[in-house]
From Swiss-Prot:
Keywords: ATP-binding, GTP-binding, Nucleotide-binding
SUPFAM superfamilies: P-loop containing nucleoside triphosphate hydrolases
Residues at which GTP binds: D64, I65, R66, W67
Residues the record lists as binding ATP: G15, L16, S17, G18, A19, G20, K21, T22
Organism: Petrotoga mobilis (strain DSM 10674 / SJ95)
UniProt name for this protein: Nucleotide-binding protein Pmob_0154
InterPro entries assigned: P-loop_NTPase, RapZ-like, RapZ-like_N, RapZ_C
Cited function: Displays ATPase and GTPase activities.
NCBIfam families per record: PRK05416.1
Keyword S-adenosyl-L-methionine: no
UniProt similarity note: Belongs to the RapZ-like family.
Gene3D superfamilies: P-loop containing nucleotide triphosphate hydrolases
Pfam families: PapZ_C (PF22740), RapZ-like_N (PF03668)
Amino acid sequence: MITLLTKPTVFLITGLSGAGKTLLLQSLEDEGYYTVDNIPPHLIESFLNILCTSNVKKLAIVSDIRWKDPQKLIELFKNVESLAKCTMEIHKVFLKADKSELINRYKKTRRTHPLGLSLENAIDEEIKVMSEIESSCDIVIDTSSTEPTEFKKRFFQMIKEDMKKLKLNFISFGFKNGIPPISDYVFDVRYLPNPFYFPEMYELTGLDMKVMEFLEKFKETHETVDKIANLAKFIQDKYSESGRIEAYFCIGCTGGQHRSVYIAQKVYEILKKEGREVSIDHRDIER
């Protein structure tokens, strides 16, 4: 069985106060990321290494000038890739905005700048301190005059090259064990001929050659694979434009051992061969 999302993905976010870090964190939380705001730079190494042994595989954290230790922050962003004890995908994000825009935002919210100086002096000082960190980030976004919905769309457009397209996770399952709660799309393939009723295939699975050869004798098997694969590609392309990160295609038969395993595996292989971002999990194959 292959585990989904085995490679942790981390967004390490910083930038100017008032530039939209909280909004970005909320957007990533909506996409299933575990989020932490205002974390001290010296604790980030511990957070990263928790991912190596926990079920949390998607993390977004904000660390910025609020801890008033810019040198620690600079060192963190320059060396963060070397801190993790396991392989993970780390995206360093820097958000900024024009000084006039930041002043307007602070006036609207009536909040105090974390540096505690007069507003203009605080912004000038922060821009000066954070400039070195900006140069070490792989994603830099200027949020000046940007509406929240536009900002989210721009962010996901900018990371598309790193994250590729929306990830499609295929799960085969047995209806007798319940539909996976995480499913976005559910396909019922119980109309296909069932190898379960043939003694020589009873204990086999949809990954075994004898079962594959049996199912491939039927026209509807090939039609099912083609239709699900084409729909999956269509949905992946459309959802990628909206900024969504992943979707779950769950394919079920009675027990989750033969037909659903075969169909899910074949669709996965087709999309994988095309270079698309996909994963496969045969949930009930060993039950």
